[in-house]
A protein has these predicted regions:
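Solvent-exposed loop segments of extracellular immunoglobulin-like
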Residues: 62-69
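A short beta-strand segment in extracellular, disulfide-stabilized domains
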Residues: 50-58, 143-145
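Surface-exposed, short loops/turns at beta-strand junctions within beta-sandwich domains
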Residues: 94-101, 187-195
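Short beta-strand segments within Ig-like beta-sandwich modules, predominantly Fibronectin type-III
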Residues: 80-88, 173-180
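Histidine-/acidic-rich catalytic cores in large beta-rich domains
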Residues: 127-161, 175-184, 191, 195, ...
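Extracellular acidic, Ser/Thr/Pro-rich low-complexity tracts
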Residues: 56-62, 74, 110, 148-153
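Short, solvent-exposed loop/linker segments at the N-terminal edge
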Residues: 44-50, 134-138
Length: 635
């Protein structure tokens, strides 16, 4: 039994009303007592890449709390929401793509009486390219802004940069040429206090080099004294070819700023602020992050940042819940609200964003809550999960709620519970304690248009019927302990003898970061934390790295790799195939005693090809990367 199956639909007209400005106000707006003005500092015009602070000033004859939504677009073109309704009345914004006339719009609303006002201002961004390329420092001392020339339409332009004295270069993503406007790139992936040479390259549609520009030099600055990083120890040095095809390691250090290092631990990039989680890097040099665990839902946020540290997209749980309240869920009722963003935010191939959020519900259920002295079920708080798809305008276009599709009678396999203030759990509000039913942690859009969802506390990876946005949300299959798949030639242990123990041992458990690899659906990797296996029978067991061949039609999997990783991380973890290599990358994110985190490269034969420990830190995820721009084919 997989719970009730029901289609999540938006209310008629909702998307039409939110696509432009995300509003659904009544005609009383025309008679509102509220006005707003918008000012820019520094004033227009300013060169491309200059950070402009936009300030909204409200005049309102009525009391109440005001929130603000900011949108940006070309002059006489469509506006795109870049910061959805929040309490901040300022928007720092850099016009970093190219020169031109832009418009910035703000809507200020009084949340007490639902009145609003709008203001729009034009702004001119001038070119930094003046017949010659230009290289400009940014607020991040390790990042430069490179401004290159216009070029023939049909070609593409990119930047190649090389540390002085080195023969190893990096290249940015290539963007389409514009015959009249400059091309601008943030250059990231450079060591501190070092000199680099960089030039633009024009390439054809087939990737052939058409011409390259002259070299320009840039000297990176020092990392500020207040920014610190964990001490690292390289246990096994990296070796070619993977040390060349994927020389960068992007770390989401918990309690530190996110950072990218080389394979010796030397910093190449960092984000200037601590965040809740860096979930995924995007092609082109942007990253998705969240800030969770704030009971003020305006400050429970999802954000996208560029390499210079500019926030390019921002929304919050309060705004998401406004949208959910306007969507029809099961039984014709409004959808449940969510409490926080956590664990996953991921840009999809179509430009939409998949994000995981936590929710909760009071249930009266014997399996979840136990029974009273009369044998009647108790009532308790249960933490669930929602999977939301946002369009590029940060508006929900599809939603899935585990309470509607998973079996509430199947509690967490190890009976996990949460108490208020426990940082390892999502926040919750309805009771002093709650059942940590799912603790889901990873989303992937599969090539057939459905969604892979890792549900840690159920010891399952499930596939959800998304059908590229038209699916009904039904669970197509469950892989793992007590699931729908049979493992061919499973691993065994003399410690695990009963059928239940054997099943717990063969499968991944309490897993993290499940993904199909190689652009298909035949090879799946995941990080096996192993909590269930160890609790059932595998005393003193370690984490394992999994790679499986998957036959969906016959519901079978065959192990390619089930590798003992030599340590135990009770939570956190990463698994991936290393770009340009047959080897695997695993991150043991919470190793004890310590704690510390361990990055490992494992060959298909199970040998350790690289190992680096980061002391005194938990690492949510880490990724081996060719550079800060190139990602595997988006799924």
């Amino acid at each position: 039994m997989m719970g009730n199956k029901s289609v999540t639909k938006t209310m008629p007209g909702l998307l039409r009303s939110v696509c432009l400005l995300g509003l659904a106000f009544s005609a009383s707006i025309l008679h509102a007592t509220i006005t707003v003005t918008l000012s820019a500092s520094p004033a227009s015009p300013q060169p491309v890449g200059m950070v402009i602070t936009w300030t909204a000033t409200v005049h309102d004859t009525e009391p109440g709390t005001h929130d603000y939504q900011f949108s940006v677009g070309p002059a006489n073109g469509p506006l795109a929401i870049v910061r959805d309704f929040g309490l901040a009345r300022q928007l720092p914004w850099a016009f970093s793509k190219t020169e031109g006339t832009y418009q910035v719009s703000v809507i200020a609303r009084n949340t007490s009486n639902n009145t609003s006002a709008q203001a729009t201002q034009s702004f001119v961004a001038t070119s930094r390219w003046n017949g010659v390329d230009a290289v400009t420092p940014t607020a991040n001392p390790l990042v430069a802004l490179f401004s290159g020339p216009p070029c023939v339409v049909g070609n593409r332009v990119r930047v190649r940069f090389t540390q002085t004295g080195s023969s190893v270069s990096q290249i940015t993503n290539a963007i389409a040429c514009n015959a009249k406007k400059s091309a601008n790139f943030y250059i990231g992936g450079m060591y501190a206090t070092s000199q680099y040479r960089m030039h633009h390259e024009i390439i054809s549609s087939t990737g052939a080099l058409v011409r390259k520009g002259n070299d320009f030099t840039f000297n990176t600055g020092s990392i500020p004294a207040g920014i610190t990083f964990p001490a690292v120890t390289v246990v096994t040095p990296a070796q070619p070819p993977s040390s060349k095809t994927a020389p960068i390691l992007l770390h989401d250090y918990l309690g530190y700023v996110p950072a990218a290092t080389d394979l010796s631990g030397n910093v190449l990039w960092y984000y200037q602020q601590k965040v809740g989680q860096l979930t995924r890097a995007e092609a082109g040099g942007k990253m998705l992050m969240n800030n969770s665990h704030n009971p003020n839902l305006y400050y429970n946020t999802l954000l996208e940042v560029d390499l210079a540290g500019n926030i390019t997209l921002w929304t919050n749980v309060h705004r998401i819940n406004e949208q959910l309240a306007q969507m029809i869920g099961p039984n014709g009722q409004p959808r449940r609200p969510v409490n926080q963003f956590d664990h996953e935010g991921r840009r999809l191939a179509d430009g939409n964003i998949a994000v995981k959020a936590s929710s909760e519900m009071m249930v009266t259920n014997a399996a979840q809550c136990g029974t009273d002295s009369n044998g009647d079920p108790n009532t308790c708080d249960v933490i669930g999960a929602q999977l939301l798809i946002l369009n590029p305008n940060l508006q929900i276009i599809w939603a899935w709620d585990a309470f509607d599709f998973l079996d509430i009678n199947r509690p967490a396999n190890l009976g996990e519970t949460c108490v208020q203030g426990d940082g390892s759990c999502p926040i919750f509000f309805l009771a002093p304690t709650a059942n940590d039913w799912l603790h889901a942690n990873a989303i992937q859009l599969t090539p057939d248009g459905n969604l892979l969802f890792s549900v840690r506390n159920q010891d399952w990876i499930i596939k959800i019927n998304y059908s590229n946005g038209t699916g009904d949300g039904s669970v197509l299959w469950r892989m793992g302990y007590q699931g729908d798949f049979t493992m061919i030639n499973p691993p065994t242990s003399p410690l695990c003898t009963t059928p239940d123990q054997q099943e717990a041992y063969q499968w991944f458990g309490h897993q993290h970061d499940a993904n199909f690899e190689f652009g298909g659906e035949s090879v799946l990797t995941t990080f096996d934390n192993g909590n269930l296996r160890i609790a059932r029978c595998d005393t003193n067991g370690n984490n394992r790295g999994y790679a499986l061949t998957v036959d969906e039609a016959n519901r079978t999997v065959t192990p390619i790799l089930v590798q003992d990783l030599g340590s135990f991380s009770k939570g956190l973890g990463t698994a991936e195939v290393i770009p340009g290599s047959p080897n695997y990358h695993f991150e043991n994110g919470y190793v004890e005693p310590g704690p510390y985190s361990r990055s490992q490269e494992i060959t298909p034969q199970g040998a350790t090809a690289f190992e680096m420990d980061s002391a005194g830190v938990l690492t949510y995820r880490s990724y081996r990367m060719r550079d800060l721009y190139t990602q595997p084919p988006p799924l």
